[in-house]
């Protein structure tokens, strides 16, 4: 695993999620268009596809997962904040191979790169609260099997 390739993949995921959220086109169309039109050199394309399609297929659950940790209404979030938080929630909830501190740091950097002035601070606050709880639930799920409730 190349960390810079993962970072570039996350940047591409945020951009593709933004395009998907704004256009409301089919995620497969967005993916193909993005891969054809955007600069993806240096990105881990397999990771890009996995995360992009994973977020899109589980978006309602990811939004529900993040909502208790938001300091404002979900509808008030900007599209970039939504994209970054959805990506981070997916990694926290589905990718135990990615340390939660890496997920948080990467999301903060994405907020600095793509978000409004203080987006990275908001993202940091949400993920600092959410990460330990979500990862604990993930541990319980992996110990008990996928069909046991953790709530």
Swiss-Prot record:
<keyword id="KW-0805">Transcription regulation</keyword>
<comment type="function">
    <text>Involved in transcription antitermination. Required for transcription of ribosomal RNA (rRNA) genes. Binds specifically to the boxA antiterminator sequence of the ribosomal RNA (rrn) operons.</text>
</comment>
<protein>
    <recommendedName>
        <fullName>Transcription antitermination protein NusB</fullName>
    </recommendedName>
</protein>
<dbReference type="GO" id="GO:0003723">
    <property type="term" value="F:RNA binding"/>
</dbReference>
<keyword id="KW-0889">Transcription antitermination</keyword>
<dbReference type="Pfam" id="PF01029">
    <property type="entry name" value="NusB"/>
</dbReference>
<keyword id="KW-0804">Transcription</keyword>
<dbReference type="InterPro" id="IPR011605">
    <property type="entry name" value="NusB_fam"/>
</dbReference>
<dbReference type="GO" id="GO:0006353">
    <property type="term" value="P:DNA-templated transcription termination"/>
</dbReference>
<dbReference type="InterPro" id="IPR006027">
    <property type="entry name" value="NusB_RsmB_TIM44"/>
</dbReference>
<comment type="similarity">
    <text>Belongs to the NusB family.</text>
</comment>
<dbReference type="GO" id="GO:0005829">
    <property type="term" value="C:cytosol"/>
</dbReference>
<dbReference type="InterPro" id="IPR035926">
    <property type="entry name" value="NusB-like_sf"/>
</dbReference>
<dbReference type="GO" id="GO:0031564">
    <property type="term" value="P:transcription antitermination"/>
</dbReference>
<keyword id="KW-0694">RNA-binding</keyword>
């Amino acid at each position: 695993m190349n960390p810079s390739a993962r970072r570039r993949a996350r940047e591409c995921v945020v951009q593709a999620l933004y395009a998907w959220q704004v256009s409301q086109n089919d995620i497969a169309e967005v993916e193909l268009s993005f891969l054809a039109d955007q600069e993806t050199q240096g990105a881990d394309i397999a990771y890009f596809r996995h995360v992009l399609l994973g977020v899109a297929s589980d978006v309602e659950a990811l939004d529900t997962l993040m909502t208790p940790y938001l300091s404002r209404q979900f509808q008030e979030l900007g599209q970039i904040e939504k994209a970054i938080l959805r990506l981070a929630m997916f990694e926290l909830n589905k990718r135990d191979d990615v340390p939660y501190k890496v997920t948080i740091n990467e999301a903060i950097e994405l907020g600095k790169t793509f978000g409004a002035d203080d987006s990275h601070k908001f993202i940091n606050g949400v993920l600092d609260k959410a990460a330990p709880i979500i990862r604990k639930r993930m541990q319980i799920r992996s110990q008990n099997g996928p069909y046991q409730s953790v709530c």
